[in-house]
Amino acid sequence: IPALIKSINRSDILFSIYDGDIKDGSSDCTDDGYASALTMFNQLKRPVVYTPGDNEWTDCHRLNNGGYDTLERLAYLRKTMFPTAASLGRRTMPLLHQGQPGEKFVENTFFSHGGIVFATLNIPGSNNNRILDDKECSYKSARTAADCDAANAEYLERDAANISWMQQAFKSAKAQKARGLVLVFQADPGFDLPETEGLDESQAPRYSGYRNFLDGVVMQTEKFTGQVLLVHGDTHFFKVDKPLYSPTRLLPNLTRLQTFGSPLIHWVRVTVEPKNPNVFAIQPVIVRQ
């Protein structure tokens, strides 16, 4: 991490976006973990926008994460990581939030820069906190049946809020005549991989918590004349492709950027190029340890 921070600080970027996971997936979800993340973010010289990942709330129910109440951890995350309307970093920038500081949906943010609209959304891994059955509820978990019922209710409410926030981002991009829109969240929401013809991975039950949102993205992208960059983490290796169809036609104006993850501690530079019809130039930056 120190080498990563040093590399970013040496660059001439204007701001950065951190797409979730401030701890590993098998350590306790202690209060100290969030404090350490704040310290890390505030070592960055320029503004950094943070969106939550599954490691810091969705998966905290796991026994190897300390067996926490995930909804309590989500509430604590909102209060701790989003105490004001500004970004993180030594130098901050103002952000619009879907909720008030420290409250529900404050983690969903919005800002514009250089003719591009940016929106971050709380869409974490582990099927977006959607629990499919009793076996999944209790597997290596401290959860009760009541906890899982509450988690599914939380998923439904947040899924609706995320879809609304995404729709508002598209509406704003159209109103501004923006050349591009960037949507950032942590989860790999599941796409149909072209390497496995005859199998549509996106329809697997473990991705069911993302279907409503992705269907909405497809619908909005079809009606948007600019370029859409969909950025996520979770899968831990770098990838750029065009994975969405509507329903069988490739969406030419949507590009997926999957970012690096542990143990590959690198970052990705995205540049807006006015004369580039694709708008976004994507460059992986390898950090030498």
Residue ranges and their predicted role:
Residues I1-G33:
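N-terminal active-site segment of His-dependent metallophosphoesterases
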Residues K6-F15, A119, K135-P243:
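His/acidic metal-ligating clusters that form di-metal
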Residues I17, V49, F111, L230-H232:
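Residue-level signal for helical boundary/lining positions with a hydrophobic bias
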Residues D24-S26, P52-H61, S126-I131, P189-D192, ...:
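Active-site environment of divalent metal-dependent phosphoester hydrolases
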Residues D31-A37, Y210-F213:
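Charged helix-capping and loop-helix junction motifs
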Residues G33-A161, W165, Y245-T271:
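Extended active-site neighborhood of metal-dependent phosphoesterases/phosphodiesterases
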Residues E273-Q289:
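A short C-terminal boundary segment appended to hydrolase-like catalytic domains
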